[in-house]
């Protein structure tokens, strides 16, 4: 099974090396591609210097455009699953294999990683937490399903 980690990156020079090391150490069965979204810092130079696998967007498309570029890359290169994985260190690559197993066994089209299941680690701002709780409640009301982190930047999808 071909698996790809899509890392949208805008001005992530301070985080990318750690993120790539996390992926290569904790999810060795996954390939990765960094989508450099026309960063204004040294993100592109860092990718080149370290030999990271990357695509360089000539204009800033925003998070949506960068992620969409990554999904198109995954599709055209025959990946069976792809996961959006923010380049800022909010997520742990140690969870990727478990997510892939859930996706495969459940027959679901998407699995969303949550930053909030474990109480330590990432903490968002108060206003953002209110928004996340609102969306969690709305999704539960409309679907009957509980999604603890609907704004997560770690979403895995199948082909």
Regions found by a protein language model. Name each.
Residues 28, 50-51:
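Short, structured coil segments at secondary-structure junctions
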């Amino acid at each position: 099974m071909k698996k790809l980690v899509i890392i949208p990156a805008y001005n992530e020079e301070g985080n990318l090396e750690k993120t790539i090391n996390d992926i290569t150490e904790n999810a060795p069965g996954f390939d990765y591609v960094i989508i450099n979204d026309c960063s204004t810092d040294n993100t592109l130079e860092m990718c080149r210097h370290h030999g990271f696998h990357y695509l360089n967007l000539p204009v800033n498309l925003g998070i949506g455009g960068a992620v969409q570029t990554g999904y198109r890359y995954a599709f055209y290169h025959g990946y069976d699953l792809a996961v959006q994985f923010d380049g800022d260190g909010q997520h742990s690559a140690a969870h990727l294999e478990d997510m892939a197993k859930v996706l495969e066994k459940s027959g679901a089209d998407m699995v969303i990683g949550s930053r909030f299941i474990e109480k330590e680690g990432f903490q968002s701002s108060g206003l953002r937490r209110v928004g996340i709780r609102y969306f969690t409640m709305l999704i539960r009301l409309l679907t009957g399903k509980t999604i603890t982190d609907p704004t997560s930047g770690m979403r895995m999808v199948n082909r």
